[in-house]
């Protein structure tokens, strides 16, 4: 085996190791991006509830949807935002690590279960959210 053969073997091994390292870095970056994407969406929900505190009881306290048309429209808009967020998280739960997966599922199920506004909105627009029912 000549020196060029040895050099070629070293180059192949280096390329394989580099590919493995790049894959691992890419995978970590994808996980971090997914996690921070979920946190960003939840932060937007928090901002919405801070800006419109009158909507929060419809999602966390089981308050039924009633009131004037303006209030109803606002609650429906927030319900759409909440369901969009939930579907995004639900669709990516396999990327979120298993330790956090139970927490995400519990949060989604508990919020959905305690919110007539979400249930009503989802019943009207279920085809928009196919990922949530999987």
For each feature predicted by the language model, list its residue ranges.
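Membrane-proximal alpha-helical anchors
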Residues: 1-70
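An amphipathic alpha-helical interaction surface
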Residues: 64-134
């Amino acid at each position: 085996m000549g020196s060029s053969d040895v050099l070629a073997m070293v180059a192949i091994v280096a390329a394989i190791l580099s590919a493995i390292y790049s894959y691992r870095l890419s995978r970590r970056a994808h996980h971090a991006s997914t996690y921070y994407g979920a946190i960003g969406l939840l932060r937007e929900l928090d901002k919405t509830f801070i800006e419109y505190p009158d909507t929060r009881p419809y999602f966390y306290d089981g308050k039924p949807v009633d009131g004037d048309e303006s209030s109803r429209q606002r609650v429906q808009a927030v319900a759409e935002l909440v369901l969009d967020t939930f579907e995004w998280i639900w669709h990516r739960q396999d990327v979120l690590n298993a330790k956090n997966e139970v927490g995400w599922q519990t949060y989604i199920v508990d919020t959905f279960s305690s919110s007539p506004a979400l249930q009503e909105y989802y019943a009207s627009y279920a085809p928009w959210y196919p990922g949530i029912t999987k």
